[in-house]
C-alpha cells in the first residue's frame, strides 16, 4: 500500500510547505527541509523493533505527521507521501545500511532519480537547500 496523507492534513500542510516553490526541485527541497527541521528520530521505537518487542512494523503516515517523530521507515514513508501529493515520483526503498535494516527514498527530479536519506537529515539536522543534492548522485 502506498503511503498517503488524509486530504485535510495533506492540503493544509502542502500549501504551507511548498508555498512559493515553482519547480519540482524546489518542492522536494522544501519537503526535505521541513521534515529535517521538524521531526526527530524515535530511538525508543527503533530499540523496541531491534529487540523484538515490536514486530511486523508498518509506518502510519498520519501518526508520524502528528507525533513529529519516527524511525527511518516512518520518515521515508512521510517523505514519499508528501512528494506524491505534489505529483513528484518518489519511492520508498528498504535494505541494509551496514548491518542495520534501513529505509530511504528515491525521488525523481527533472528526469533524474536521486537517493535521499531523511534519517540522516533528521539525526544530523542537515538543513541546507543548496547542498540537498550535493550528498547524493543521480541513479543511472
For each feature predicted by the language model, list its residue ranges.
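Hydrophobic/aromatic-rich core segments of domains that either
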Residues: 74-140
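Active-site nucleophilic cysteine motif
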Residues: 27-31, 68-83
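Secondary-structure boundary elements
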Residues: 4-66, 137
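Residue-identity detector for glycine
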Residues: 20, 37, 52, 70, ...
Amino acid at each position: 500500500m502506498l503511503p498517503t496523507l488524509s486530504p485535510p492534513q495533506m492540503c493544509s500542510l502542502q500549501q504551507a510547505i511548498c508555498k512559493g516553490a515553482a519547480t519540482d526541485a524546489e518542492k522536494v527541497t522544501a519537503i526535505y527541509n521541513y521534515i529535517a527541521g521538524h521531526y526527530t528520530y524515535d530511538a525508543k521505537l527503533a530499540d523496541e523493533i531491534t529487540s523484538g518487542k515490536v514486530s511486523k512494523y508498518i509506518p502510519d503516515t498520519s501518526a508520524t505527521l502528528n507525533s513529529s517523530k519516527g524511525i527511518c521507515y516512518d520518515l521515508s514513508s512521510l517523505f514519499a507521501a508528501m512528494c506524491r501529493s505534489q505529483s513528484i515520483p518518489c519511492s520508498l526503498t528498504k535494505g541494509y545500511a551496514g548491518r542495520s535494516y534501513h529505509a530511504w527514498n528515491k525521488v525523481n527530479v527533472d528526469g533524474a532519480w536521486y537517493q535521499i536519506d531523511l534519517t540522516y537529515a533528521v539525526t544530523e539536522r542537515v538543513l541546507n537547500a543548496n547542498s540537498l543534492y550535493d550528498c547524493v548522485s543521480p541513479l543511472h
